[in-house]
């Protein structure tokens, strides 16, 4: 077994144990929203097992606008699947390549 492969297995087990421990801490009626960076990442892969848990939303490729939207949702109400999809679409629209945005103001460097 190559050393890197062994370390990868150890890391995967650690992530799996951490995710399981975290999820065990929630009551069945608790809403759980998981925001991960990479769909193919190890953390997302471990949370994927909980995708059918009631009141659980798992979103990969998250960005700060999405995190803000989720945090600002009304407390005491479950977020619907439709609302989560809306928030994901809104967050996608916030990703911009700023160099392509037209400059309508004066540029002092010119």
PLM feature spans:
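Structural motif
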Residues: 12-20
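Acidic beta-strand-to-loop metal/phosphate-binding motif
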Residues: 31-37
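Single conserved hydrophobic/aromatic residue that forms the stacking wall/gate
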Residues: 1-11
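Short Gly/Thr/Asp-enriched flexible loops that form oxyanion-binding sites at enzyme active sites
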Residues: 41-54
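Short, glycine-/small-residue-rich phosphate/pyrophosphate-handling segment
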Residues: 73-101
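Short acidic DE-rich linear segments
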Residues: 104-110
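Short coil/turn segments at beta-strand junctions that form active-site/ligand-binding loops
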Residues: 29-31, 54
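Short, acidic/small-residue loops that bind anionic groups at enzyme active sites
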Residues: 53-70
């Amino acid at each position: 077994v190559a050393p890197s492969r062994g370390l990868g297995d150890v890391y995967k087990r650690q992530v799996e144990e951490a995710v399981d421990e975290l999820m065990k801490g929630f009551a069945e009626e608790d809403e759980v929203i998981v925001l991960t960076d990479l769909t193919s990442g190890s953390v997302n892969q471990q949370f994927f097992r909980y995708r059918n848990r009631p009141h659980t939303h798992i979103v990969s490729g998250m960005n700060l606008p999405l995190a803000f939207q989720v945090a600002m949702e009304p407390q005491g109400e479950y977020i619907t699947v439709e609302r989560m999809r809306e928030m994901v679409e809104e967050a996608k629209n916030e990703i911009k390549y700023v160099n392509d945005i037209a400059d309508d103001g004066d540029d002092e460097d010119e």
